[in-house]
Amino acid sequence: MVSAQVATELGQPIPLDTQHAVSVCFPTWKSVISYVEKDPKVLGCLKSGYPRFWIHPSIQKLRDILIEKYAKENETCFCFPSYRVAKRCREYVRRKCAHRNGKVRILQLATAKPINEEQKTWKRECKIAVVFVDGAYENILKQYWQYTGEIISSRLAEYVLHELFMVEKKSSPAEEKEYIEMRYGRNLNFAFADRAKELIKKRIATKVIDKDEHDEEENYHFLAGNQDEQDFQDTFLDSSLNEANHGEDHDGGISGEVDSQEEPHNGLVSTIPPEPIEMSTIEEEQSVEEDAGRCALRVCPERDVFLFPSGMASIFTAHRLLLQWDSLRLNRSRNGSDVTSSPPNKKTVIFGFPYADTLHVLQEFNETYFLGEGDESSMKELTKILHSGEQILAVFIETPSNPLLKMGNLLELKRLSELFGFFIIIDETVGGIVNIDGLPFADIVCSSLTKTFSGDSNVIGGSMVLNPQSRVYEFASRFMQLEDEYEDLLWCEDAIYLERNSRDFIARTIRINYSTEYLLDKILKPHVGENKLFKKIYYPNLTSKETLTNYDMVRCKKEGGYGGLFSLTFHDEDHAAAFYDNLKLNKGPSLGTNFTLAFPYTLMTYYHELDMAEKFGVERNLLRISVGLESQSILGKIFQEAIDKTVEI
């Protein structure tokens, strides 16, 4: 296995030379601190970033054009993938600006539909909605974008830029097709997107990849276009909007203004280079074996699996679903666009120390108990709450948690849920569907497809799986069929990339499991101790005996391992910084990538809440490692070299 190119300069995209990369290089410990302290020099270096935190240049260009054309004085905007999402954002802004004179406007845009079968191969109707607010409230829009994950992707933004602001009114279909071919090569087939989504859902539902899925006639290729035409160009042309944009909302937001439906006159030529996807060389027989003990519960891909533009969007939707369930219990009708929560909703529970934005989104939209230890003590605390007579709506839990790799007792949670009537929502992103099978213990399972499922770190997406045996299943199924509540907003090009990337996700997961255990056992564990470099290793079979027992209860029988994510802590920050700086690896946010990725998780995520994080064992000097597909010998040498250089200081 050839190791991936390593980004070494601050702000470089990870992977290198990838227009839609979802990580960014922070080569030194100091660069991370400078970033969270908002050093302008560091911020100005960033050429990439995680999509919910960093605005991709294509999205920013789209925003700039929309602000120039449609914004009123001092207004700014954010783009969302549908009108209904924009309305939910508007409700969020209204709630945040309840005592201020906030004004919110929504502009709807749509690209033209394909008019025949041939055009369907390179043309797609795309509707977006733009939320305009006073610039003073821009951070509120950013919060909604970040917390809920209901975002537009950079590929979608590229397509909208071209279709709405580049194509001349009299441009021919042949000229539009030529643009698509320039971006992707002649064989990219937009019509394959629906089939791609079917395959993605099937893989999530069955945890099996069939060789027969890859019919050669359905394949597509990513061929390089004219490199002289790959850079962004600032050419403005006359263009027109799809006349089918009809204003659905006439209440006009806080200010009482009608949502805008103006026609733009200028546009931007914007192209991206192709991104070849290299397949793993692992034997496919590992990937396609039927009934490998991965699934204890069968689900229907089309009926029970749903796709989203991000993993956070799936968690947010699961939360909205349960709030709607609770509102019916109270005989209150909640409008689908109203994502706020007010008493007497039952409270939700976060069990364990979760990914930061999971905590944020639940606390923003409902009252929440935060049981951050995620162990037996938290279970006792939850039991105490339940025995007090208070009714709980749901428990959200990561399996295992990020970044401490703790595993709660799902069997005990399941027993309590049946006894006291709350629901269980599992985020399976870190463990992965090959390693653990949490669905029998959950009502809903959410996951980020951006991570191990994709692996290539060049596309973002999420999924939700409903447990057909859950008592909320019938309600959830109806909820997910309502257009006001759920829309398939995964852009067609992103679906195509996700399908292609995930064709070997099972084999990749197995390989990463083995490499991680090798790295821990042979290289890192000998250096853990009171007078040694590392203070502690957090990994499902090392965090604690309790975590190991709980993890093994739900580990897939045959091929399930402990995953590719672990965290290291140090006795002091000097050694933590030196070790990080000496690692000759890609260093940036995200996890589950095909290449090994290191990152000072606590510094980046909780720099301004360090006391809170450390209260739950998430130390300032924690370094999170996501193991990739490099050979064990290469990984061993890289980590050993960093250890040797660090102990010398």
Swiss-Prot record:
Location of N6-(pyridoxal phosphate)lysine modifications: 451
The GO terms describing molecular function are: cystathionine gamma-synthase activity; pyridoxal phosphate binding
Q: What is its EC number?
A: 2.5.1.48
Pfam family of this protein, just one? Cys_Met_Meta_PP
In the record, Phosphoserine modifications are located at: 287
Q: A GO BP term, please? A: methionine biosynthetic process
Q: Where is this region: Disordered?
A: 242-273
- Name the cofactor(s) required for activity, per the record: pyridoxal 5'-phosphate
- GO cellular component labels: cytoplasm; nucleus
Taxonomy, superkingdom: Eukaryota
Which reaction(s) are listed as its catalytic activity? Answer: O-succinyl-L-homoserine + L-cysteine = L,L-cystathionine + succinate + H(+)
Alphabetically sorted, this entry's keywords are: Amino-acid biosynthesis, Methionine biosynthesis, Phosphoprotein, Pyridoxal phosphate, Transferase
Q: So, what pathway does this thing act in?
A: Amino-acid biosynthesis; L-methionine biosynthesis via de novo pathway; L-cystathionine from O-succinyl-L-homoserine: step 1/1
Q: What does this protein do?
A: Catalyzes the formation of L-cystathionine from O-succinyl-L-homoserine (OSHS) and L-cysteine, via a gamma-replacement reaction. In the absence of thiol, catalyzes gamma-elimination to form 2-oxobutanoate, succinate and ammonia.
What family name appears in the similarity comment?
A: Belongs to the trans-sulfuration enzymes family. MET7 subfamily.
Q: What else is known?
A: Present with 2810 molecules/cell in log phase SD medium.
Protein name, as recorded: Putative cystathionine gamma-synthase YML082W
Protein source organism: Saccharomyces cerevisiae (strain ATCC 204508 / S288c) (Baker's yeast)
